Amino acid sequence: MSQEDVLAGLGEIIQEVAGIPAESVKLEKSFLDDLDVDSLTMVEVVMLCEEKFGVSIPDSEVKNLNTVADAVNYITSHQ
């Protein structure tokens, strides 16, 4: 799956759980500062990403996913 596909899928997930329009989800955006995705919402985002993309994202890695690019890179490198 390409980075663009993962970004689009992640945008859909964030729109679903946080109400942020998918087109606003860009690589440079910070989950907390730009998209207002707090730690509780992030747990839901991670669970849905694991289901959608077939990856496992351990709790120890979640704290390193600060931006959309961090998440996209993690997902694409672990598929």
Residue ranges of predicted features:
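Phosphopantetheine carrier-protein modules
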Residues: 17-36, 52-66
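Two-component histidine kinase catalytic core, primarily the HATPase_c
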Residues: 41
